[in-house]
């Protein structure tokens, strides 16, 4: 069904459902904006229901829009991943792309479904809006005193930064060998490998860097999801207090 192309884009069944979910979600956001106090793109806010509604359905303008938009977003993301599966199978490729994308979906679900379910109310979900979302992040940080002390957050941020560094190095080495000076020949992979062996003593290779990149990216998404799921459902105190175990550690050098 819908097995055709529009220009270079493959449509497919899940392409159609992706467009339907996306269109409905955008329409609901515009509806919430039209009924709200402002059209300022920075201040548009689609808030989750009040905590008093628990895990039930809320009235449209009291969080119901947020619930419907969330359903549309989940449907759109899942259909997009299934579209990637469909295209990969047609081309005889592996399913590495939808597999990696599924970790991004998991990170989103952690914010708007998994954590609210564990805490017993949809009101614990993240709002939709630029400034409102930043305020929500800030409030979560203050709620746990110093969120940067969250060990899962530390691991996630480490993977994010390492991913940026790895692919910054990868992209720059590709550009450097393919853009030689005037009168010089284009260099090959042997020059790439030699450069990194000279600089850091080891070259992971052209295939290895992409395997590493996938690992770093999905690890960053996974641990970012874990860090927010832990905060509230499994740990309610300030995150600096979690590290008190180190003070009682037999081989601690502190104190």
Curated annotation (Swiss-Prot):
Pfam families: Photo_RC (PF00124). Keywords: Bacteriochlorophyll, Chlorophyll, Chromophore, Electron transport, Iron, Magnesium, Membrane, Metal-binding, Photosynthesis, Reaction center, Transmembrane, Transmembrane helix, Transport. It is a multi-pass membrane protein. Fe cation binds at residues 170, 210. GO terms for cellular component: plasma membrane light-harvesting complex; plasma membrane-derived chromatophore membrane. Gene3D superfamilies: Photosystem II protein D1-like. The keyword Transport applies. GO terms for molecular function: bacteriochlorophyll binding; electron transporter, transferring electrons within the cyclic electron transport pathway of photosynthesis activity; metal ion binding. A ubiquinone binds at residue 196. The chain crosses the membrane at residues 12-35, 64-92, 95-120, 150-179, 205-231. It comes from the Bacteria. The keyword Zinc does not apply. It is found in: Cellular chromatophore membrane. One of its GO terms (biological process) is photosynthetic electron transport in photosystem II. InterPro entries: Photo_II_D1/D2_sf, Photo_RC_L, Photo_RC_L/M, Photo_RC_L/M_CS. (7R,8Z)-bacteriochlorophyll b binds at residues 133, 153. Reaction center is composed of four bacteriochlorophylls, two bacteriopheophytins, two ubiquinones, one iron, and three highly hydrophobic polypeptide chains (designated L, M, and H). Belongs to the reaction center PufL/M/PsbA/D family. The reaction center is a membrane-bound complex that mediates the initial photochemical event in the electron transfer process of photosynthesis. This is Reaction center protein L chain. It comes from Pararhodospirillum photometricum.
């Amino acid at each position: 069904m819908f097995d055709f192309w529009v220009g270079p884009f493959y449509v497919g069944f899940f392409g159609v459902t992706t467009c339907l979910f996306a269109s409905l979600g955008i329409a609901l956001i515009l509806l919430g904006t039209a009924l709200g106090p402002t059209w300022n793109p920075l201040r548009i806010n689609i808030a989750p229901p009040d905590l008093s509604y628990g895990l039930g359905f809320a009235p449209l303008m009291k969080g119901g829009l947020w619930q419907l938009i969330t359903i549309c977003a989940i449907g759109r993301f899942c259909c997009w991943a299934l579209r990637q599966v469909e295209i990969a199978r047609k081309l005889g490729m592996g399913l590495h792309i939808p597999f990696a994308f599924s970790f991004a979906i998991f990170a989103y679900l952690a914010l708007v479904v998994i954590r609210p379910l564990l805490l017993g109310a949809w009101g614990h979900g993240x709002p939709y809006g630029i400034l409102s979302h930043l305020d929500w992040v800030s409030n979560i940080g203050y709620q746990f005193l110093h969120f940067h002390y969250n060990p899962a957050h530390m691991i996630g941020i480490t993977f994010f930064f390492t991913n940026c560094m790895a692919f910054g190095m990868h992209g720059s080495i590709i550009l450097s060998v393919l853009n030689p000076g005037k009168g010089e020949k284009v260099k090959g992979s042997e020059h790439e490998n030699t450069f990194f062996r000279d600089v850091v003593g080891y070259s992971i290779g052209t295939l290895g860097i992409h395997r590493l990149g996938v690992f770093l990216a999905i690890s960053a998404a996974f641990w970012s999801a874990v860090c927010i799921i832990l905060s509230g459902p499994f740990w309610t105190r300030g995150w600096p207090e979690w590290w008190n175990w180190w003070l009682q550690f037999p081989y601690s050098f502190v104190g």
